[in-house]
Amino acid sequence: MPRLPFLASTCLGALALAAAPEPRFERRTITTDFFSEGCAVGDLNGDGRPDIVAGPHWYAGPEFRLRHTFAANPGRPYDPLGYSESFVQLVADLNGDGKPDVITVGFPGKETYWYENPGAPGTAPWKRHLFLASTDNESPHLVDLDGDGRPYLVCMSGGAVGYAKLNPLDPTQPAKFVPVSPAEPKKYQRFTHGLGVGDLNGDGIPDILERSGWWEHPAATAPLDTQWKFHPMAFSAGRNGGAQMIVTDVDGDGLPDVLTSLDAHRFGLSWFQQKRTPEGITFVEHRILDDKPENSAGGFALGQMHALVLSRQIVAGQPALVTGKRFWAHGPKGDVNPQATPLVLWLTWAKDAEGKVVFNPRVADTEAGIGTQFEVADLDGDGRAEIVVANKKGLHVLSSAR
């Protein structure tokens, strides 16, 4: 993405902001060290205040000045020309002791570990347990698939789409991966892009989405090894797949739609409008952002949208999609326009006079960029969300103000 379209886009965004007061964001850099391309938020020390996890460290809220090391680390930051061993980080109580633990999904195709929160403060590394020996796809999700309150790691492994769930009787043992699809190693490999979880058919049970379609969750009474039904749908036609695929009702018709980037290393952001026909569920694509300003909402030709989050705390009572440009995904010479402005954007949408859904993107930041996963959460209890990003530029908090 050349810088010129961004400058034009900034002017358009300024006009929109002048019309009505909206959140603006101020960047605070916690560290410029590169330890992770994902991050998580949770109250790790039990003081009632959210803390931040990034790489082998956690930062105590609300100031995030005090850095604790909970995992073995390389002893120095990773080189931004290369990669870290932390692509996605998640927080959940995995052993039922009431304390949030940390899950680190490593480099694609490698191990996912979870770190047991000891509760009491200390300097010793937390106990590390293997969650899954090989985690494929670059956007795994941690969700409750069956309503029992325990999280599943939805990912790909062994050439198949599926999930891994720890044994509640002994969560320190590695999880068993349960495939929901046949094994297709060439299709579902370590660097596969695009993955989502959501109830697409309205039966109250989450389904799994990927770039070539969606897998329908069978009835809750079905045996564990039941293969899920596949519904083909090109969510990234002619492209390589995006990142986190979001299920939400965009147009207000009561049917779940899909928001997704089309190529995590190039261009494209679309929403897929769900339609019901006698033959079943279909989707109609509506492009939001693309490789040319004239084809993009607000004139933003934004590339490398390698992470997406849907939040209802940016604008009260209204959903907002947060995304941005992954900084140096493949170094300073890889991908398309690797040196383009590392924007972080947030987008809201509404219907115009003709009933068409129109997206309105605004700039949250021009320096931080994103990684492969990030968090949007209220860190200070003021009811407004902060955007927390970790990537090759370090760890940053974008705080909203009015």
Language-model features: locations:
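Bacterial N-terminal signal peptides that target proteins for export
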Residues: 1-11
